Amino acid sequence: MSLLFDPGFVILREDQSVKLFNIILVMSQVFGGLAVLLVTIWMSKFESGFAWNEDPDKEFNYHPTFMIMGMVFLFGEALLVYRVFRNERKKFSKTLHVILHSCVLVFMLMALKAVFDYHNLHKDPSGNPAPIVNLVSLHSWIGLSVVILYFAQYIVGFITYFFPGMPIPIRQLVMPFHQMFGVLIFIFVSITVAMGISERAAWKHTCWTKEGQMCAQQATSSFVGVFTFLYTVCVLLLVLNPRWKRQSLPEEEGLHHLTSSHSMSD
């Protein structure tokens, strides 16, 4: 694996490398789009659609939908910004990176509200309040941990790289940790999604738990997980290959040297 991502280990010519990048990029968009499409079909067709807190059972359906849209697809797109737009000015890429992560944060918060409302406002068949205890499953424990880590990553990244005035040496010191934790959180998101899909299927899909057969609902949920994993793999291949890493433009190199010299003289 270390050899695969060694920038000095070159098998493909530059034109072949660019072609491979584009192929994996297209595959990532197809897999990510299918994951979003299928989770929407799963929740709208097989799980009775969407509503807000007037119908907690339907409000829950926003949870997996928004998590796939935000924490999987938009998170992955945010990671890809510096690869897809590696020949654009850094200010453009950085702004788009922050916008996408901010959208992820919004989707994440709405998804969390949906699942907590579902638990807290749950009613029994007679219509009486029957709250479900929060945070008891392994999925919820790991999911909450991922949410906290993501929020911390967002705050640290925003202050360090988007908020003006942070010294360049500090940015350089934080960067490898920022990149590493971003990738790790993204991987754990995919794992958490798989756990959530399995948990929901075990509770709600009676075709295989009681009838012992595959059904469209179960197949749809399983394909959501498959395409989530495939999207994750494609994003990681694109992000971890140093050959596709964004390189500073000539004008940015000059500005960096001027800024560094000014900092040293101070």
Swiss-Prot record:
Residues the entry annotates as binding heme b 1: H63, N134, L135, V136, S137, H139, E199
Q: Which reaction does it catalyse?
A: monodehydro-L-ascorbate radical(out) + L-ascorbate(in) = monodehydro-L-ascorbate radical(in) + L-ascorbate(out)
Q: Where in the cell is it found?
A: Membrane
What do the Gene Ontology cellular component annotations say?
membrane
The record lists the membrane-crossing segments as 23-43, 62-82, 96-116, 142-162, 177-197, 220-240
GO terms for biological process? ascorbate homeostasis
Query: Is the DNA damage keyword given for this protein?
Result: no
The EC number of this protein is 7.2.1.-
Which parts of the sequence lie on the Cytoplasmic side of the lipid bilayer? Answer: 1-22, 83-95, 163-176, 241-266
Q: Which Pfam families match?
A: Cytochrom_B561
Q: Where is the Cytochrome b561 domain?
A: 27-240
Q: List residues in topological domain: Vesicular.
A: 44-61, 117-141, 198-219
Q: Which UniProt keywords apply?
A: Electron transport, Heme, Iron, Membrane, Metal-binding, Translocase, Transmembrane, Transmembrane helix, Transport
Classify the source by domain of life. Answer: Eukaryota
Record flagged with keyword ATP-binding? no
Membrane topology designation? Multi-pass membrane protein
For this chain's record, the cofactor binding note is: Binds 2 heme b groups non-covalently.
Cofactor dependency: heme b
Q: What InterPro entries does the entry give? A: CYB561/CYBRD1-like (IPR043205), Cyt_b561/ferric_Rdtase_TM (IPR006593)
Task: Please tell me where heme b 2 binds in this chain.
Answer: R83, K90, H97, H178, K245
What is a single molecular function from GO for this protein?
transmembrane monodehydroascorbate reductase activity
Residues annotated to bind L-ascorbate: K90, K94, R171
The free-text function statement in the UniProt record for this protein reads: Putative transmembrane reductase that uses ascorbate as an electron donor in the cytoplasm and transfers electrons across membranes to reduce monodehydro-L-ascorbate radical in the lumen of secretory vesicles.
Q: What is this protein called?
A: Putative transmembrane ascorbate-dependent reductase CYB561 homolog
